[in-house]
């Protein structure tokens, strides 16, 4: 075996000296780590080993490999590489086909296709980056006369051909160095012959090899590049592919600028290898919409993609650009469209100049109109009369339901300008997640009370109570926190009212609550100032003060949420008591009538949006007294009719589609006289809404006809407070008045509730000659008690007819549309 190894060593030395296509790795594979010493023995004089190193260095420099002879062993500091690695550096050895990619004589990339992947191997992707040229194909010859391949083509046959060529080359090269494939016994004989060869013969051969190397160095030639590639490949079959290029065609670009000035960065020509991103031209007073490939501006283009061909004519489209103004845009609507979602639609007449490319939805201060913050943005439409739409999620932001919005543009980094009118949110009921229907009680009969026992005792179907702001501001117990518009408020939990409302809900009793600001130290910050009039019992909201207004909005939102649940809900909300008697019950200072209406309407609208965005079916009412075309006796007061008409106009102007309702007090005139059916002072109680002085239960149909004809049948009426005294005329007269009034309300389809003043006489009212209770001050039942308790039952006449006949006479003629069926049901048609 030692002789065989010596033979191999001599052959290796010759191959290092004489240019050959036999890969070094073929020889190196014959040596194990243990056989290196044997090889060294052959070169015991050192001359042959040194010569081999020189030759190896030249080859390595060509292929960027290491300058040491490879033995197949790994050095400690070099990490082992996988045989299946996709790409190798020149000189790196890997098992497979070594693919060398050339372009313009330069090796661009090498990688290895493992032998196992030969069947699925494909041509690599096209090269990129040769300016002015297009990659055409890969070719097996540099001049393009060889086999052609497109990226992605199979190269299975090419690899097979390379295999056969390599095998043939190896056979030829072995023959050239004197090796001949023979039977094993002949090989053994040759081993013996080699052992007998004298050292003189070996030295002669090595001298000859050295002479050949010297000649090569002197004439300046180098080994053939195919040999270098084969050596670099290691245990691989080397395959070379050449990139073939063809000159790219240039295409002309023509710009139709329509009075504009082109950007100098826009090219005049392009090739299919170019990707062109067009820049914006300029035109004074206009905004550039875009480039189009047609004069009718149908096909917009911003980029010429790579691979495009053909000349282009581009048309610049412009839209007039205007400076920001308060009327640059118009609001089509701002409304609730579904639970927790406000939708805003606007039209922008012309492109509005700004610091960026967006229009903004801005939340503005309801008083000053100044921008508080942006809550949405959309890209600017690049055409005249462009439509824009915003969708705003209000979850966690109850202030948005009561808030005011507008369209804005950005002037600078943190400054905005409003470019449209400002608007509140219409259809707030759509924002509610509670879609429960409006609760309709069994009948229209009701009473003012805060004790559930009074309600059940009288079989009342609806209850009314006053909710005073001082109660909400109490801090002695049960305080809750509530966050509104980024600020935390502290309100009383109103647990007594909560319990009453829950009891009523459970028993099928409809709930009506009236909100009033009473005179109290805790309510001073909500009013314009203390009234100079002793007659002032309640105040109105100071909506002109931003801080007061925010607190008011927070209160309304809090109440709407607290009493908007399915197990604790108020169906009817009333803002203020007899508000047309301003200095008595809604004092906002000595302001003009229009200012008074504006301040009341602002507060009403806030309450409306707050409660309806929590419980969509809730109703909100304005409260008026019976002085229809005449002022009451208060220092500052207005007629009920003028107040209602002015309010209706103002609230409609403030916010679209506010479905307000009317809570009316149909007391008799004078208040102490219960006989409203008498013919006295007939001219003051007419059926003409334009001329009648008062509207009481005597001519209540004048009110309902007026409201229906003027505002529609969707505007509902509740008679939220009236009472009939037993002081003058006696208890029978009081009982007859209650029964007749109820029958008139029950048979009128515009009226939803008839609520009497009190369960029991109150001492301060009795002192004024007003004994309006069903019981006296000591709790003794009056005649009116049983009449009221049973007048809405199926046996109604059993309890009412006697007093009606004795006190009224032909009472049925005074009740339009009377029928017994209407008395005991909720008649609304």
What positions do the PLM features span?
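Sec-dependent N-terminal signal peptides of Gram-positive bacterial secreted proteins and lipoproteins
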Residues: 4-24
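Secondary-structure capping and domain/repeat boundary segments
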Residues: 85-189, 201-321
